Curated annotation (Swiss-Prot):
It comes from Streptococcus pyogenes serotype M3 (strain ATCC BAA-595 / MGAS315). The keyword Transport applies. NCBIfam families: PRK13628.1. This is Serine/threonine transporter SstT. The lineage of its organism: Bacteria, Bacillati, Bacillota, Bacilli, Lactobacillales. One of its GO terms (cellular component) is plasma membrane.
Length: 404
């Protein structure tokens, strides 16, 4: 037994997760009635979601309270990369929709409990209100905009505190980080359970009716991950970006794919940034911020499904309108984390550009929920892995400028 344990300890986490995925698929196909097994996945995701707000608050307040005057954090470049990457993803989705026009079979059931925002202004109003949320409520409800804003305020206030107080804050951040390490080490079991639940509840063939839509969505996201993002990286760093890109996809995207939660993946991303050797002053802020505004995958979902609706209803569209759609989708996607239902519930905002009624737009949302098992997984994997990628290339660019 000890030999098996020692062998398991020596195997890398990624290989363990791969083994968990294979076992989860086999159990989902061969023994779908083991419904009690799904609780392990819920516990794993619940643990990550529970610790993530505390981790963000502890790390951000600690980083800012210890920050020396004039120290570079590269946040301006990172935010520009987040916004540009989201817009580029939206533009790629428009081009994909032109090359592979989709039509949808509507009259799908719609979740009437969810209501879409009435426009981009409402999305941003919601985000601004989240900035001034009660700090305890922000932590309890995982409102990362609120957690970030209060962590920054507390960090600034703690700059004037004694060294003993700052040391206490640093210890709290280190303890929280250690708890995260323990939870992440349970990823193989948690992901095995999540894969089992997906296969046992949905089957492997349930999405065949929407195969082309899934292919377009996933293909666009893969193109952005393997072509567009590396192109952005090489323009900034002047180095081969693929070792970093593939590492981000492997160590961040893989976990995000199965948890389907950017919030749950924040601890994973922070640990990856630490392993890469990035500055904690930077990534403790950029990673939770990226989970909120870096939404390339969401922009792709909004544009692909909106243009599918446009083609379904035979509405003509010119290039300038498509460009405007990309801007609206990018801006809306940046607020996706502040909307119940995420990117899918922002589709009516984009559809309104073409005069598509809210009732019809919500039917398109219904199609999105049907393919959500795949769409949401790929979207989260792209969004979350890009947070680490853009943080890393911004820091790389800073050190190159400094050496020059």
């Amino acid at each position: 037994m000890k030999k098996i344990y020692d062998l398991w300890v020596r195997v890398s986490l990624i290989k363990k997760i791969g083994i968990g995925v294979v076992i989860g698929v086999m159990l989902g196909i061969l023994a779908p009635d083991l419904t009690g097994f799904s609780i392990l996945g819920k516990l794993f995701v619940g643990g990550l979601k529970a610790i993530a707000p505390l981790l963000v608050f502890a790390l951000v307040s600690q980083a800012i309270s210890h920050q020396k005057k004039g120290k570079q954090t590269n946040m301006t470049l990172i935010i520009v990369l987040y916004l540009f990457g989201t817009f580029a993803s939206a533009l790629v989705a428009v081009l994909t929709a032109y090359l592979f026009p989709l039509t949808l079979v509507l009259n799908t059931p719609v979740n009437t409990e969810l209501s879409p925002p009435q426009g981009v202004a409402e999305v941003f109003q919601s985000l601004l209100l989240k900035l001034v949320d009660n700090p305890i409520n922000a932590l309890a409800t995982a409102n990362y905009i609120g957690v970030l804003s209060w962590a920054i305020i507390f960090g600034l206030a703690l700059k004037a505190a004694s060294q003993e107080t700052k040391h206490l804050i640093k210890t709290a951040a280190e303890v929280t980080s250690q708890i995260v390490v323990w939870i992440i080490n349970l990823a193989p079991i948690g992901i095995m359970s999540l894969v089992f639940t997906t296969i046992s509840e949905n089957g492997v063939g349930i999405l065949s009716d929407y195969a082309f839509l899934i292919l377009v969505l996933v293909g666009t996201m893969v193109f952005v991950a393997l072509v567009v993002n590396p192109l952005i990286a090489v323009l900034i760093t002047r180095q081969n970006p693929y070792p970093l890109v593939l590492r981000c996809l492997r160590e961040s995207g893989l976990t995000a794919f199965f948890t389907r939660s950017s919030a749950a993946n924040i601890p994973v991303n922070m640990q990856l940034c630490q392993k890469i050797g990035l500055s904690k002053d930077t990534y403790s802020v950029s990673i939770p911020l990226g989970a909120t505004i870096n939404m390339g995958g969401a922009a792709i979902t909004i544009n692909v499904l909106t243009l599918a609706a446009v083609h379904t209803f035979g509405i003509p569209i010119d290039f300038l309108t498509a460009l405007l759609l990309s801007v609206v989708a990018a801006v809306s996607a940046c607020g996706a984390s502040g909307v119940a239902g995420g990117s899918l519930l922002l589709i009516p905002v984009a559809c309104s550009l073409f005069g598509i009624s809210n009732d019809l737009a919500m039917q398109v949302v219904g199609v999105g929920f049907i393919v959500g098992v795949i769409q949401d997984s790929c979207e989260t994997a792209l969004n979350s892995s890009t947070d680490v990628l853009f943080t890393a290339i911004a820091e790389n660019a800073f050190w190159k400028r400094k050496k020059a």
